[in-house]
Curated annotation (Swiss-Prot):
InterPro entries: Ribosomal_eL20, Ribosomal_eL20_dom, Ribosomal_eL20_eukaryotes. It comes from Arabidopsis thaliana (Mouse-ear cress). One of its GO terms (cellular component) is cytosolic large ribosomal subunit. Keywords: Ribonucleoprotein, Ribosomal protein. Gene3D superfamilies: 3.10.20.10. This is Large ribosomal subunit protein eL20w. One of its GO terms (biological process) is translation. Transmembrane segments: none annotated. Coiled coil: none annotated. It comes from the Eukaryota. PANTHER family: 60S RIBOSOMAL PROTEIN L18A. The gene is RPL18AD.
Amino acid sequence: MSVIRLHQYQVVGRALPTEKDEQPKIYRMKLWATNEVLAKSKFWYYLRRQKKVKKSNGQMLAINEIFEKNPTTIKNFGIWLRYQSRTGYHNMYKEYRDTTLNGAVEQMYTEMASRHRVRFPCIQIIKTATVPASLCKRESTKQFHNSKIKFPLVFRKVRPPTRKLKTTFKANKPNLFM
């Protein structure tokens, strides 16, 4: 399995100052990309579509990577997104359990690619939030909220107790059925 390794960036930019507008409006965007170059590219793509500001007439003020405050605790993340499919544009809400928001976004991208055949450029993340357990909607995230959850060992392979009893070739195939 290949890992995407997405990072969350905060990109700040604006249109170049002109005689007509000496203090142009500053735009800040949080987005996910594999590196800073792609984050800048995505920023100018969205700014060109929404605010009619092109990179040639624009100015990049700052680009910072955003890190998770508690990357060791498991949280529920809600992701609101918009994606383009063969039939048009669709809005969607997804829930994931992960230790970081970047991990949840990676899960979302892989799930959208597998279930809906929607690739990275066709997905626009509208909003993300940490969702408390009481407000979770999806059954796939709710099932892990039980404190007495158990995971059965389905693939039990009996191993020899000592190395002396280990053989290279077996007379019969081992039965792994429980």
